Amino acid sequence: METEKKQESKVRRIVGEVLSQVLNVPILSGALITFFFFKLPSDIPNRLAGFGWALLFLSLIPLCSLFFYIPGKVQEKARVIKRQRIASFVFMIVSYPIGFLVLWLTDAPDIYEAIAVTYTLVTLGLIIVNFLLRYKASGHAAGVAGPVGALIYLFGLIATPLLALIPLTTWARVSA
């Protein structure tokens, strides 16, 4: 019975970790940017360049924070996770506003600029709550709620099933 519980706990932790990575902010922002790229009319100026810049600054650069999950000399899991969490915020708070500036300067489609501003403000809010006020707010949940809210705003009730991603993300973070 005891080993069965341990096995179940291990499976739950693995599933939680996999879902956490799939629902990771840079992955979701990349999916959102790609979705809008294919939804935008093909004759919009700077559509492809805007997509490339948005993907670079809102997805690929922030994704580099995952390299901080590599234990290196520090083997203690809690310290590795804390290091990666801090690196994540640093990558995002630097990359998002620079991305917005590049998108604005290159006259990218407004939707990419709006996404960059939104992620910048959410990240700033999370930094204030997590590091200054010392409450632990979930960046994963915020990173899922933003795109889900945007899609519901744009597409209406048809997009409401995406709301299920928010509790799924919460469960994944608690289980991981």
PLM feature spans:
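The first (N-terminal) embedded transmembrane alpha-helix
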Residues: 19-39
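Helix-coil boundary and interhelical linker segments in multi-pass alpha-helical membrane proteins
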Residues: 33-51, 100-114, 151-160
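Short, Lys/Arg-rich, polar N-terminal cytosolic tail immediately upstream
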Residues: 1-16
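Membrane-helix exit/interface motif
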Residues: 68-72, 98-106, 125-133
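Juxtamembrane helix-capping/reentrant segments at transmembrane boundaries
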Residues: 75-91
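Membrane-embedded catalytic cores of phosphoryl/pyrophosphoryl-handling enzymes
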Residues: 113-176
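Loop-to-helix transition at the N-terminal end of transmembrane alpha-helices
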Residues: 45-60, 81-84
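Alpha-helical transmembrane segments in multi-pass membrane proteins
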Residues: 53-61, 91-95, 118-122, 126, ...
